[in-house]
């Protein structure tokens, strides 16, 4: 009877986990219980911290920047990734990286493996939130970055960098909404600008009068061998003033396979205990029905 009880509990747990596995969204939990994480670094040298073993990292944090999965701005659950930069020199990001290593202990994190060829990327989407207490310029909000190695050879690092998506470059004069969640999608028609990649800052690859209007499709054609080494959502630097907000629900589609991540705060021990009791109760009910 005891072994059967164990098997029923295990089956219940597997059932719950399987429901999450086959769902479209993977939940990444904070390192700490509510109110969650708050990683900060007052130094000018960037530092990072792993979010468990999820492949996500609080990264590039410096000059008082703060980031962490917290309960401040819950979205599709009990949490999201809180972000704050108190000055133009501050920075804070969250990144998904391929088998990342740290530059030191502590240190910043960087990718050592590729995620996929850039040419196979179909789209990326994410949700962001700007608190009305933010004093930075009105068009600023958490940006989306696709991290790349331009020639596809990860042994040469001088061509690493990223493509950046911001609303202001898509829509002209723009004021970011406040105190509400905004979901936006990047696809082949979206305008993106670059940093790094061996071609300088905001390179005008399509030779138009505007250096920020190269589409994702044009970037794919310009770098046919480029590989994706990470996805980034973050703030700064160079944002004069204070920014307070959050990001959540990043999703990318590569060759028809969509990966979505929802960030949540790890349940309190009492919540987990109640969850366990619920599983035990369900298993006990099955046993009683079987005995009857």
Stretches with model-predicted labels:
Residues 25-26, 34-79:
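Extracellular glycan-recognition surfaces and repeat-rich motifs
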Residues 85, 128-130, 148-150, 235-237, ...:
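Short beta-strand segments enriched in hydrophobic/aromatic residues
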Residues 114, 129-210:
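Extracellular ligand-binding interfaces
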Residues 180-265:
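Terminal, low-complexity interaction segments
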